[in-house]
Amino acid sequence: MDDATLARLHSVYDGLSLVQRHHLKVIVESRPEVLSVTLCGFLVDLGLARVDGESFTATDDGRYVASLF
């Protein structure tokens, strides 16, 4: 990971509330193959993903997760 990307991630993380940080920790600790609908819902609530038909995709600014499904 290059320095610019790391700096951007730190900036994003610093802007998260404590609840958002907790949810992000849960997401990071989960294996992608066991992501539940509830957890995917948290990603949407946090603005980390958006619903696109039957799948979840990264937000348009590309700051976060890529496609989940």
Show which residues each predicted segment covers.
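Short, hydrophobic-biased segments on the C-terminal half of alpha helices
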Residues: C40-G41
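Intrinsic-disorder/low-complexity regions
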Residues: M1-D2, D60
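Short amphipathic alpha-helical interface segments
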Residues: D2-V37
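A short, conserved structural fragment
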Residues: V44-E54
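Accessory beta->alpha helical hairpin/"wing" motif in late/C-terminal subdomains of nucleic-acid enzymes
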Residues: G53-F69
